[in-house]
């Protein structure tokens, strides 16, 4: 009885912390439940650093599940990412010395950019790079930010000549020239080393190895994925994608 009274007292004293804790306990397999609690915390204190960055992550995890190209669903997905950007920017305003706000802004815009055409994707490139870099500068072990940076290098290297010309016109000649395959591999390898059970780290690294013709290394990552437990709402789809990619490259020989 005393423990129940104590718990109710703590909730009354700090309802923001209570909602954040409830969101955390829902886990990454239930981002919709997480988002409900983080938004409840923000309804009480819209400046909460923790509630804002976690709400940005959760709403992005809800949005990433919308894979349809139907116009109404694309608008829904983009609107969720737009709200996620607001949350991430509020988190940075609340405390720019911590890495999470910088990471979630880079992540939200990175995911949004992958749903857009080439010109719009290029427009987000500098913010994504700068914010992920800040997160890693603050915490060099932030594996999720390393993933964003690795993906950034790979995505820029995959741009066509025209797209890179547009990027240079927008940002100046030097910025997009930062992108290189070595850093794509290095950051994604770092992400895998720091979080070896993270399925999407390994999948993205495998895709980069395929780009580079390093099929044996890609297969190593894809085989590892098959044995990993599901931890994220998108992991079942990631596992399917990994299995399909493995089948596609199963007999490929490494390029010299």
Model-predicted segments: where are they?
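Cleaved targeting-peptide boundary
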Residues: 9-21, 255
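Terminal, low-structured helical/coil segments at or just beyond the last alpha-helical repeat
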Residues: 15, 162-172, 196-199, 219-221, ...
